[in-house]
């Protein structure tokens, strides 16, 4: 293969890989309202119930929602957990909306939530996982230099759901979801160049957009 052909093939690889597909959905169960002086809080599912939603994903959604709107406040997850310790730690927090009365039955907790005007708790579940992978890279060094050759790829799926709970009504008012699939690849002709689908960051963007849109509807 000529040098020009190799370059053409490499450009083609850059164009066709590292892509992702995003699907978002929204479900509204009952009427809801929120004002500018009220807050929402995001919590992840517990590691006791399976795979815990990644910490960096939770931080991404918290930050993204804060930047996208000024219609309501968002209390950072870790700050909320510290203020209400130990009631909303991963091992003790309610895992379903049916568990809310167990926590809100504590008058001290309920009064503090009311004083801080925390109206909605958003329970985020999901994870990013690799579905399939293949290929191989080989790197070597010699007297004339070194390099890597080969081709590797993997498919990732990032699927997350946010269940929105009204703390005053102790009920779920809706759900939003983001599902992102993508293929990442690393072609190597002397120098390996990762081309990443970044499904988790795209899922963060999609889910935060859906949450903001939910409260804007």
Enumerate the language-model features and the residues they cover.
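Sec-dependent bacterial lipoprotein signal peptides
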Residues: 1-19
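Sequence contexts marking disulfide-bonded cysteines in secreted/extracellular proteins
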Residues: 20, 61, 138-140, 147-149, ...
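A mature extracytoplasmic/lumenal domain signature
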Residues: 46, 78, 125-128, 164, ...
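Short, solvent-exposed beta-strand-terminating loops
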Residues: 72, 77-78, 131-133, 171-183
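Short secondary-structure boundary motifs at beta->alpha junctions and helix caps
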Residues: 144-212
């Amino acid at each position: 293969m000529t040098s020009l052909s190799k370059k053409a093939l490499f450009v083609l690889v850059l164009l066709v890989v590292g892509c992702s597909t995003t699907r978002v959905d929204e479900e509204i169960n009952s009427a809801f309202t929120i004002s500018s002086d009220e807050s929402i809080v995001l919590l992840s599912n517990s590691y006791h119930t399976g795979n815990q939603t990644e910490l960096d994903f939770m931080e991404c959604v918290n930050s993204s929602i804060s930047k996208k709107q000024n219609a309501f406040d968002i209390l950072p997850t870790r700050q909320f957990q510290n203020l209400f310790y130990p009631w909303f730690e991963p091992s003790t927090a309610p895992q379903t909306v049916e568990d809310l009365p167990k926590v809100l039955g504590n008058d001290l907790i309920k009064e503090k939530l009311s004083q801080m005007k925390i109206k909605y708790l958003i329970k985020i579940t999901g994870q990013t996982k690799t579905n399939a992978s293949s290929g191989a890279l080989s790197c070597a060094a010699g007297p004339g230099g070194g390099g890597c050759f080969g081709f590797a790829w993997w498919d990732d799926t990032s699927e997350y759901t946010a269940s929105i709970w009204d703390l005053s009504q102790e009920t779920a008012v809706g759900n939003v979801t983001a599902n992102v699939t993508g293929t990442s690849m690393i072609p190597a002709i002397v120098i390996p160049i990762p081309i990443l689908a970044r499904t988790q960051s795209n899922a963060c963007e999609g889910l935060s957009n859906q949450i903001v849109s939910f409260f804007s509807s």
